[in-house]
Amino acid sequence: MTSRRVVPDIAPRELTMATQVMNHVRDRIHSGDMRPDTWYSVYQLSEELGISRSPVRDGLLRLEEAGIIEFVRNRGFRVVEPNPSDVADIFSIRLSLEPAAAARAATHAGPGDIGKLRELLAHMAAAIERQDEATFFDWDQQLHDALASLGHSHRSRAILATLRTHTRLLTDSTVRKYRSLEQVYSEHLPIVDAIATHDAPAAAAAMRAHVSATGRLLLAQNLRKAHPEWDAPELDRRVDEIWERHTAHL
């Protein structure tokens, strides 16, 4: 155990234009305003947002990297139908990395690190009071990044940051219909508590429970959207089947 602080300083994040483009397109996709059967152009989107084409293209390229859209030469871009297996695949990778990172954080965290984690939780709680979902999940992202940084693996931290971004882009929020901000917040408390007491197995177990809960909810949401004709038992069976196929080895 060390007392050296390794959690990055906490600071509000300003969204780049490319990120704003990503969020705008994501919101339009999830609202049904952008559909897979329609072609769109960078020029039209640039005009709509009132910004130059360069940041629009940057944001769209990141969405293409995440599998949200695809560019076709001389046609523009279109929305890609989400694949439930993509969601399960992302979470299988997260499950292979994040519990181990939480366990390492419990070993390495010093008093200053734990204080920063508590501060991030306080920011999340304040966002709940305001019912500010966007800010809540920004602090949530920072908390997960802080935990990954305590794991002393820069490569894992970078991979996880990319996967969490892909998760937010590929799926809609689970909060609106399936769980509250308070429930999401409560899943983080045992993770930080275990790190504060340097209980590595408990930290890993709490992180596994949190990531699994989120992954299964997002998978169910994705399947429900693709197959509205399925009843609840059929949906649960399909979720179990896909989840088991992707995570049984972990």
Question: What is the predicted function of each stretch?
Answer:
Residues 1-107, 220-250:
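Short linear motifs at protein or domain termini
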Residues 65-70, 163-165, 179-182:
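Mobile beta-alpha loop/short-helix "lid" or hinge segments that flank ligand
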Residues 83-84, 170-174:
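Short alpha-helical transmembrane interface motifs in multi-pass membrane proteins
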Residues 90, 111-172, 185-194, 202-213:
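Conserved amphipathic alpha-helical segments that form helical-bundle/coiled-coil interaction surfaces
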Residues 106-107, 152, 176-177:
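Short helix-capping/hinge motifs at transmembrane helix termini and TM-loop junctions
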Residues 180-250:
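C-terminal regulatory/effector modules of DNA-binding transcriptional regulators
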